[in-house]
């Protein structure tokens, strides 16, 4: 471009050219496009575009001008007003010059053409105008509709505005409330925060206080422990020092007495010319050495029995130096005897002086010493407390027997035949009595030996030295060997006794360690084997100082009573080696006498006194009274129901340093076995020997042995000092139990030693340790009445509800023994009053049995402190039924605490506490029981006796006077109008229960009782099973399933006086009933008169909620029709709803009228019109609506055609306004418009299960209420109605399910359900029955025959005719679905008759007679009363059902009628050969037996006889229609099915019947009759077997009846299934069925059996 631009510029350098030429060139160069610049080109382009646009405008203007000129030139001469000119124009323009013809040649023709053209145009315009007018009309219609819509829209908009305004207001209110509530919430939150802060502060303070308190508790516990330790140390030291002092004193005294005795014995031996007296001294000293035990220095030498026999000799001279008295419970004992340091008191030892009495054998000394009276100093005996004999002439004797008693042969019989080492706690007498023939001087000497040996110390503590010569009882050889060393002494003694034949020890006797009842054999009897029985003589002379002993201070421990008077001398006989010995007990302390029950003499000796004492002989070697001795005590019967075990203190008391022989206790007299002699209730109740209790519980020292035994002894005797010493020892088992299971705690609690119990509990003793019978320490203390021990044990968490082996609790034992304080403590601790013993007794039984009024009051009225501590402040809640609040109530205004179940509890024999009190004449106890509102005085025992029957005269009078008024409570539904409303079977009144009204019953209690009775009754009649009122009370729901409750009550009549719940009169209910002579209480339910439906619900048993729903439908929709099977109470429901509506409208101020019209076949449409007009239901359009309410009921609409009767009224009924009028043509040709107003209600009833045909057109215009037989309310109505009938018959009581009445009612209910199931299965809904016909079922207790007869009448009169008509109607070929039963043939064919008879027979057997509660024999008699039961079902079974495969048409079925090929075994059944048919029947029965089929008909003989009479075999079942064929197949399937008793599984596909051929499991299909209305539920695919298989598990042989042939057909598939697999379950997975009603049970139809087996479907 630069070059271009440059070249465009003129070049002035070429001057030589002339000027003209230059100018021309310059001009050319200017217009050269190529030389133009870009901007110049753009300018040039724009100029050219402007020129083009100007040219276009000029061209357009020229064209327009040309057109105007052309038009003016051509058409300017023409005028539109002249048609000729137009025609001429067209002519000239249309054709060429050649074709142009002159237009005006014929003006007429031209005019005609113009006219024709105008006519055509006019016609076209007229059609267009008509179309425009129609469109205009449509537009106007649409405008009108639009205006109406706009008006509606405006109305809706206005309503919405109003609603929005209201909602806005509500929202504002809610917002305001929310703000207020949020403010309150904030305030509450602030308050809560403040409270939480305070709570935290309080928690902090509380925790600080708790810490301080725990610290204080720890300090106090530590201080107590230190104090206890110091006290125990002080006690130990004191006792040791005291024992040392006693030892020294005793030693000194013994030495003096020994010197005197030695001198006297030497003289006596010299006079007796005895050759062996020299042996006594060495043996004496030797024995002394052997028994010695050091006090404080030596530990207890606890040698076992076997060891001690050999080691005894090693203990040497410690005896003389250190005689030890162990502080046991202070008792009479010998101060001379040294024992082990810690209290190993030699329980069984004859504890003599150190010189003599400590020896194991003193027989030589006794035998040689002359009988002398011991000096007073030698006989210083202190008794531990006042024993019963202390005040008598006979002083209490020491607890240890003198050694001679055991050594001498005479002693052996006393302990047991061979048990010399028995520890006689009344030593002198026992020893003396052993040798009644002895010289009195020798007896006196022996007496002195014994007395000195057992003299107690000043504190009454016996110092006993363990014997050293005793041999282990298990080794008789050792025993005899040891005894041989003592033979000389024994022979010396025996010379002074009457000679007896030598009686060696009994072989086979139990060893010492046994706790058994037989006496130990191998005891260390110091007598020689040849020693004979020693005859007992008079008691020895009493030492002069003995009586004074009773004046010594008694120990602090409580003394237990003794059994016998010591002043009363009596001879007790003890059987020893079958010989009886007498012992004089008068000089013995009763507290120390022990009885051995096992050796009770069978024949008492003539000397036996009524209250003999018994000698407990003591082994001279120190044998303890062991468990062998005590275990003999179990022979006595227990007074108390439990605690039959001897006390622990009777356990074997083994002495550690000696050989312990369990010496048996020998019973001296049979009379000593008398219970009740002991004051210890527990002892006597436990069966202890009364003589044993003083031994173990009296103040005298009990025999002591090993540490555990010592512990039990100390606990038994209450020796706190010894117990504390023992508890401080290490390694001691404080929970040690003897063979009877008695622990130390048990013994202490049983004997009431509270201090010992506290010590043991603090030491950790097991508080709930039980003995062998399950009794705990608390049981023992409660039985004995030791309430302080009970309180202490409870505070240590003893189990207050512990039950012994027989079920006795501490409360029971306390009640049994009348221990009021213990009962109160246990009740306050919260013990259970309802625990029962094994015999069914409760504490109430126990208290009543003893006649203890205080105990019974406590049980009935005392509350646990959890409620209130005071017995009289509390007010118990009122009991449900009849409560007494007695004026005479022993507890003032308080009410019983125990429930009625406990008061009325019966034991094994059926006896209640009232039976016991009445039979024993405890009138006060019976009166207290009668104060309880729940007492049932009519309760019967197992012998059907009431308390009145077994009562004494006084108690009978009391029961008759205190018995409650029994007022029947009845429910009334008001007066029901008789007639055709379906209420004929409804009872006006029903008794629901009897109210017990007592003098103490208040009006509040009465009101609660009535309310509870009503609630229970409503729940009982509406429950699913037979529940009693007691079972129903567990349900706390206020309303029953039918909707009734206490709110349904209108008023209550007390006799003739009105009363309302909660109302009170000045008189009590008792007085009011008596004064007004009210014989019943009637409850009136609210009914239609009050605008309620409660009475209708109760009368008809239709749930209240459903009735209220029906009423709502009528009031809301105005047109309601009730339809269901005949007898479904449609008329009753409609009429009751109408009554309720009428009274509601009248209460609202309207007048109301009910108009009933019964429709029949002749009821015409004109009559209906007159009815509507006359009742003012149809009113003229010109007339304004009336305020009157009209309710029209059209009954039995099934008898007319709904479409014909109501067809014209459908629209006016649906749209009730003048806009939808109904025109009525009058007879004179005029018409008038009517309409239905809003105040008209129309109800109709139809007794038809379903609508058909043209009636279905009516269905959409009405609201329909369908009353199905298999759905509520009809399904449960009959069950509830009959249950209420039974309750009324039993006067309010619900019988048990096994009652015959219940079974009969259940059968009637099952008949109705099974019958409808079968009829539905057959496809005959016309024959379905509602429950109305079954409401009249008679309820006669004990007479089921009446119900069966009623069922026969119902069957013959109603059921069978309906079934017959329905079957014929279905079997007829030309069946019109609209007319139902009316078109059945009047003259049915024989085939149809056969079908009817077969159907009746099958229904009768499967639905009616099946499950009848009558025995088979009676049922066979009544079966003849039923019509149609004798038809031979073999006809049905041998009928061939034709196969029809899936997808085949009916035409194909008719073609393929030839039966399938049979197998070679069976010939095909023939219609024309009766023989073959009967053979088929027989074969069928055999096959059924093979399959374990158990279905049989009632009368086989009659069936067989009638086989040829019913129909000719040539004509049997020659059915001519598909309906008949389908029906027969239905019947066949019903026969073969075992689950048709409740056909809830309805399947139209069925099995082929078995035809005895080889084909197996071959199903046949049948089409559903297209003319029959079948619900989809009734169709299901075919299964290989329809319902169930035949299985062995379901086969039952009928009782007492051989199986008979069954003519019922069986599906072929079942033969195969039964033969191939008989153990399969009755339901198969291949079975596919559609269930109706969701029933999950299939019933097996066993005809004429009393039970009906059911199996659930899988």
From Swiss-Prot:
Keywords annotated in UniProt: ANK repeat, Cell projection, Coiled coil, Cytoplasm, Methylation, Phosphoprotein, Repeat, Synapse
GO MF term (any one): protein phosphatase 2A binding
Domain of life where this protein originates: Eukaryota
Classification via CDD domains: bZIP
Low complexity compositional bias, start-end: 385-394, 509-520, 1619-1633
InterPro entries: Ankyrin_rpt, Ankyrin_rpt-contain_sf, Cortactin-Actin_Reg, Cortactin-binding_p2_N
Chief place of localization: cytoplasm
Phosphoserine PTM sites in chain numbering: 1521
Intracellular or extracellular location(s): Cytoplasm, Cell cortex; Cell projection, Dendritic spine
Function: Regulates the dendritic spine distribution of CTTN/cortactin in hippocampal neurons, and thus controls dendritic spinogenesis and dendritic spine maintenance. Associates with the striatin-interacting phosphatase and kinase (STRIPAK) core complex to regulate dendritic spine distribution of the STRIPAK complex in hippocampal neurons.
Gene3D superfamilies the record matches: Ankyrin repeat-containing domain
Modified residues (Asymmetric dimethylarginine): 495
Gene: CTTNBP2
Region annotation (Disordered) ranges: 1-24, 203-235, 348-437, 451-475, 495-612, 1448-1478, 1538-1595, 1611-1642
ANK repeats: 706-736, 740-769, 773-802, 806-835, 839-868, 909-939
Biased composition (Basic and acidic residues): 214-235, 1539-1558
GO CC, alphabetical: actin cytoskeleton; cell cortex; dendritic spine; FAR/SIN/STRIPAK complex
Protein name: Cortactin-binding protein 2
Quaternary structure, from the entry: Interacts with CTTN/cortactin SH3 domain. Interacts with STRN, STRN4/zinedin and MOB4/phocein; this interactions mediate the association with the STRIPAK core complex and may regulate dendritic spine distribution of the STRIPAK complex in hippocampal neurons. Activation of glutamate receptors weakens the interaction with STRN and STRN4.
UniProt organism field: Neofelis nebulosa (Clouded leopard)
Signal peptide, first to last residue: none
Biased composition range(s): Polar residues: 399-418, 580-590, 1559-1569, 1581-1595
Coiled-coil positions: 119-276
Upper taxonomic lineage: Eukaryota, Metazoa, Chordata, Craniata, Vertebrata
């Amino acid at each position: 471009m630069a070059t271009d631009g440059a070249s465009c510029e003129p070049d002035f350098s070429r001057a030589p050219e002339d000027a003209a030429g230059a100018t021309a060139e310059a001009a050319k160069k200017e217009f050269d496009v190529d030389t133009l610049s870009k901007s110049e080109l753009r300018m040039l382009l724009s100029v050219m575009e402007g020129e083009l646009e100007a040219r276009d405008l000029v061209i357009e203007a020229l064209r327009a001008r040309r057109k105007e000129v052309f038009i003016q030139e051509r058409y300017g001469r023409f005028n539109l007003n002249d048609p000729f000119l137009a025609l001429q124009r067209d002519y000239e323009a249309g054709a060429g010059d050649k074709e142009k013809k002159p237009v005006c040649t014929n003006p007429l023709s031209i005019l005609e053409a113009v006219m024709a053209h105008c006519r055509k145009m006019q016609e076209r315009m007229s059609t267009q105008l008509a179309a425009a007018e129609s469109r205009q009309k449509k537009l106007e219609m649409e405008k009108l509709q639009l205006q109406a819509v706009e008006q509606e829209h405006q109305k809706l908009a206005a309503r919405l505005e109003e609603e929005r305004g209201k909602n806005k207001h509500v929202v504002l209110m809610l917002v305001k409330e929310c703000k207020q509530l949020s403010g309150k919430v904030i305030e509450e939150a602030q308050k809560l925060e403040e409270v939480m802060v305070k709570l935290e502060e309080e928690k902090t303070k509380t925790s600080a206080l708790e810490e301080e308190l725990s610290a204080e508790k720890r300090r106090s516990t530590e201080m107590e422990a230190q104090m206890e330790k110091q006290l125990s140390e002080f006690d130990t030291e004191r006792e040791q020092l005291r024992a040392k002092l006693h030892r020294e004193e005793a030693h000194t005294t013994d030495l003096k007495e020994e010197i005197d005795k030695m001198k006297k014995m030497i003289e006596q031996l010299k006079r007796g010319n005895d050759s062996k007296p020299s042996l006594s001294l060495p043996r004496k000293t030797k024995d002394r050495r052997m028994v010695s035990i050091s006090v404080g220095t030596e530990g207890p030498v606890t040698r076992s029995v076997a060891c001690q026999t050999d080691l005894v000799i090693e203990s040497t001279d410690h005896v003389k130096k250190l005689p030890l008295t162990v502080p046991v419970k202070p008792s009479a004992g010998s101060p001379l005897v040294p024992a082990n340091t810690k209290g190993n008191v030699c329980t069984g030892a004859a504890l003599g002086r150190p010189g003599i009495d400590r020896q194991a054998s003193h027989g030589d000394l006794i035998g040689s010493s002359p009988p002398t009276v011991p000096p007073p100093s030698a006989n210083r005996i202190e008794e531990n407390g006042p024993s019963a004999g202390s005040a008598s002439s006979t002083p209490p004797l020491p607890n240890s027997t003198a050694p001679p008693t055991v050594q001498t042969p005479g002693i052996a019989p006393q302990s047991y035949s061979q048990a010399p080492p028995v520890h006689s706690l009344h030593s002198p007498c026992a020893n003396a009595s052993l040798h009644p023939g002895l010289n009195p001087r020798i007896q006196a000497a022996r007496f002195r030996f014994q007395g000195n040996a057992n003299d107690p110390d000043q504190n009454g503590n016996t110092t006993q030295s363990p014997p050293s010569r005793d041999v282990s009882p298990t080794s008789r050889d050792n025993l005899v060997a040891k005894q041989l060393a003592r033979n000389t002494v024994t022979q010396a003694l025996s010379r002074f006794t009457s000679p007896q034949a030598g009686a060696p020890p009994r072989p086979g006797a139990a060893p010492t360690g046994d706790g058994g009842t037989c006496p130990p054999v191998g005891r260390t009897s110091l007598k020689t084997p040849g020693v004979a029985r020693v005859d007992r003589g008079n008691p020895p002379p009493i030492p002069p100082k003995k009586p004074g002993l009773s004046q010594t201070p008694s120990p602090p421990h409580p003394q237990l009573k003794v059994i016998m008077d010591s002043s009363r001398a009596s001879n007790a006989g003890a059987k020893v080696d079958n010989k009886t010995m007498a012992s004089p007990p008068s000089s013995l302390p009763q507290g120390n006498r022990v009885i051995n029950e096992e050796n009770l003499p069978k024949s008492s000796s003539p000397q036996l006194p009524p209250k003999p004492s018994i000698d407990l002989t003591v082994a001279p070697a120190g044998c303890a009274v062991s468990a062998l001795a005590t275990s003999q005590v179990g022979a006595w019967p227990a007074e108390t129901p439990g605690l039959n075990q001897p006390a622990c203190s009777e356990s074997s008391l083994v002495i550690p340093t000696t050989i312990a022989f369990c010496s048996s206790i020998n019973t001296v007299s049979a009379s000593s076995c008398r219970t009740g002699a002991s004051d210890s209730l527990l002892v006597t109740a436990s069966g202890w020997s009364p003589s044993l209790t003083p031994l173990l519980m009296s103040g005298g020292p009990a025999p002591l042995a090993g540490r555990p035994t010592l512990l039990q002894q100390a606990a038994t005797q209450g020796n706190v000092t010894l117990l504390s010493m023992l508890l401080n020892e290490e390694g001691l088992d404080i929970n040690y139990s003897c063979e009877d299971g008695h622990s130390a705690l048990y013994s202490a609690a049983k004997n009431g030693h509270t201090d010992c119990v506290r010590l043991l509990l603090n030491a950790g003793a097991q508080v709930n340790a039980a003995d062998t019978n399950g009794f705990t320490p608390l049981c023992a203390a409660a039985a004995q009445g030791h309430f302080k021990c009970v309180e202490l044990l409870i505070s240590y968490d003893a189990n207050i509800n512990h039950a012994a082996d027989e079920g006795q609790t501490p409360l029971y034992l306390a009640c049994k023994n009348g221990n009021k304080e213990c009962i109160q403590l246990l009740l306050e601790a919260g013990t259970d009053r309802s625990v029962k013993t094994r015999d069914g007794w409760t504490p109430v039984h126990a208290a009543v049995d003893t006649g203890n009024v205080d105990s019974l009051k406590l049980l009935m009225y005392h509350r646990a402190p959890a409620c209130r501590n005071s017995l009289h402040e509390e007010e118990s809640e009122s009991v449900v039924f009849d409560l007494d609040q007695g004026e005479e109530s022993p507890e003032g205004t308080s009410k019983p605490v125990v429930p009625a179940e406990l008061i009325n509890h019966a034991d094994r024999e059926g006896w209640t506490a009232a039976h016991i009190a009445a039979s024993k004449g405890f009138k006060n106890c019976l009166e207290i029981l009668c104060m309880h509102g729940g007492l049932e005085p009519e309760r019967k025992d197992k012998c059907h006796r009431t308390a009145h029957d077994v009562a004494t005269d006084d108690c009978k009078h009391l029961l008759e006077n205190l018995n409650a008024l029994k007022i029947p409570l009845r429910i009334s539904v008001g007066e029901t109008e008789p007639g055709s409303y379906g209420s004929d079977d409804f009872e006006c009144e029903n008794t629901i229960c009897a109210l017990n009204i007592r003098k103490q019953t208040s009006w509040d209690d009465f009101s609660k009782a009535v309310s509870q009775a009503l609630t229970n009754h409503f729940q009982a009649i509406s429950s699913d099973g037979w529940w009693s009122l007691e079972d129903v009370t567990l349900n706390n729901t206020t309303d029953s399933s039918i909707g009734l409750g206490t709110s349904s009550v209108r008023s209550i009549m007390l006799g003739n006086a009105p009363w309302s719940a909660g109302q009170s009169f000045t008189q009590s209910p008792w007085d009011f009933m008596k004064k007004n002579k009210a014989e019943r209480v009637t409850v009136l339910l609210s009914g239609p008169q009050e605008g309620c439906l409660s009475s209708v619900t109760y009368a008809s048993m239709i749930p209240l909620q459903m009735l209220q729903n029906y009423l709502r439908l009528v009031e809301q929709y105005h047109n309601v029709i009730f339809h269901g099977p005949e007898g479904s109470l449609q008329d009753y429901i409609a009429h009751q709803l109408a009554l309720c509506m009428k009274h509601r409208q009248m209460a609202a101020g309207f007048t109301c009228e009910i108009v009933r019209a019964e429709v029949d076949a002749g009821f015409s449409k004109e009559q209906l019109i007159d009815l509507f007009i006359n009742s003012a239901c149809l009113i003229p359009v010109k007339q304004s609506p009336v305020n009157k309410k009209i309710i029209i009921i059209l009954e039995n609409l099934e008898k007319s055609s709904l479409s014909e009767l109501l067809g014209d009224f459908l629209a006016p009924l649906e749209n009730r306004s003048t806009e939808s009028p109904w025109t009525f043509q009058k007879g004179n040709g005029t018409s008038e418009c009517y309409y239905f107003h809003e105040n008209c209600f129309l109800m109709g009833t139809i007794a038809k299960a379903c609508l058909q045909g043209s009636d279905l057109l009516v269905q959409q215009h009405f609201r329909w209420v369908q009353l199905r037989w298999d759905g509520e309310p009809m399904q449960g109505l009959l069950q509830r109605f009959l249950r209420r009938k039974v309750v009324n018959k039993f006067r309010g009581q619900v019988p048990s399910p096994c009652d015959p009445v219940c079974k009969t009612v259940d059968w009637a209910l099952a008949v109705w359900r099974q019958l409808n199931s079968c009829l539905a299965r057959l496809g005959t809904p016309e024959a379905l029955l509602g429950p109305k016909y079954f409401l009249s079922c008679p309820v006669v207790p004990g007479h089921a025959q009446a119900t069966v007869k009623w069922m026969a009448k119902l069957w013959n009169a109603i059921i069978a005719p309906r079934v017959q008509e329905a079957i014929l109607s279905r079997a007829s070929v030309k069946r019109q679905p609209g007319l139902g039963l009316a078109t059945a043939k009047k003259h049915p064919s024989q085939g149809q008759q056969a079908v009817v008879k077969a159907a009746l027979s099958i229904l009768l057997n499967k639905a009616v007679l099946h499950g009848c509660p009558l025995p088979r024999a009676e049922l066979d008699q009544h079966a003849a009363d039923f019509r149609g039961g004798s038809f031979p079902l073999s006809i049905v079974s041998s009928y061939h059902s034709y196969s029809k495969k899936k997808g085949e048409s009916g035409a194909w079925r008719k073609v393929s009628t030839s039966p399938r090929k049979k197998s070679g075994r069976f010939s095909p059944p023939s219609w024309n050969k009766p023989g073959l048919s009967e053979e088929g029947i027989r074969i069928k029965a055999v096959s059924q037996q093979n399959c374990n089929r158990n279905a049989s008909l009632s009368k086989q003989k009659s069936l067989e006889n009638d086989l040829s009479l019913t129909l000719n075999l040539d004509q049997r079942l020659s059915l001519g229609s598909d309906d008949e064929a389908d029906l027969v197949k239905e019947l066949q399937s019903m026969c073969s099915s075992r689950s048709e008793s409740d056909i809830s599984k309805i399947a139209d596909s069925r099995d082929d019947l078995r035809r005895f051929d080889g084909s197996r499991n071959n199903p046949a299909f049948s089409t559903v009759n297209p003319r029959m209305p079948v619900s989809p539920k009734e169709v299901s695919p075919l299964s290989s077997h329809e319902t169930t298989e035949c299985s062995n598990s379901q086969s039952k042989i009928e009782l007492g009846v051989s199986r008979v042939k069954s003519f019922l057909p069986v599906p072929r598939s079942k033969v195969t299934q039964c033969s191939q697999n008989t153990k399969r379950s009755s339901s198969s997975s291949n079975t596919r069925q559609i269930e109706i009603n969701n029933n999950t049970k299939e019933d097996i139809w066993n005809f004429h059996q009393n039970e009906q087996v059911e199996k659930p479907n899988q």
